[in-house]
A protein has these predicted regions:
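Alpha-helical oligomerization segments with coiled-coil/rod-like character
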Residues: 1-70
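Catalytic cores of peptidoglycan-degrading enzymes
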Residues: 72-203
Length: 203
């Protein structure tokens, strides 16, 4: 009857509201987790940079920096794909906001990810919401970060050359779908906008 119909409708509305609230809380938690991973990455880079500077102070021989300010606008893209999100603050899922310290490049799962410059693998492993992550050191305080990989094909301490495959695209289960999260960190661990450093893509 009419009363039961209204009761069922109200029950469905209540369930929908609960599911919406659960979805929003889950989205907020994912954003919080991503921000925590960014902070952990910054801590890792700071530790690596301290070790590099201590080695310099001891007179250790160092290779020439392979990324410098002369590299602006010249670095190759680490993977073929489309730009999903840009450096800086951006809308997140379910009306959240997230500040990206790099860019997201959408590409198929398993697509090869290549080093944008020669360097040394200084960190490789699982990093929470960023999944498998590889960090390369390029000298002069510059680092590149390749995250949301399905796997890494390099190991800690490996030297790599520009264009060498270091892993493959993963991230199919993320809000953005399969993609590479790519960052460039400069002196003093400052996150730099990769689009200023990568070659301009033809429209």
């Amino acid at each position: 009857d009419e009363l039961n119909r209204y009761s069922d409708l109200e029950t469905r509305r209540t369930q929908d509201l609960r599911e919406t609230r659960r979805g929003i809380r889950a989205a907020q938690q994912r954003v919080t987790n991503s921000e925590k991973e960014e902070n952990r990455l910054t801590d890792v880079i700071a530790r690596l940079e301290r070790a590099r500077r201590e080695a310099l102070a001891r007179g250790a021989a160092t290779a020439r920096a392979t990324i410098t300010t002369a590299s602006l606008g010249t670095l190759p893209w680490p993977v073929d794909g489309n730009l999903l999100y840009r450096f800086g603050p951006a809308p997140g899922p379910d009306n959240t906001e997230i500040t990206w310290h790099g860019v997201g490049i959408g590409s198929a799962v398993g697509a090869p990810v290549r080093a944008v410059a020669s360097g040394t693998v200084v960190d490789v492993g699982e990093r929470g919401t960023y999944l498998t992550t590889v960090i390369l050191q390029h000298g002069g305080g510059y680092y590149t970060i390749y995250a949301t990989l399905s796997d890494a094909t390099v190991h800690l301490g490996d030297p790599v050359v520009a264009g060498e495959v270091i892993g493959h695209v993963g991230g199919a289960s993320t809000d953005q779908g399969s993609h590479l999260h790519f960052e460039i960190r400069g002196p003093d661990q400052i996150a730099l906008d990769p689009l200023n450093w990568l070659q301009k893509k033809q429209p």
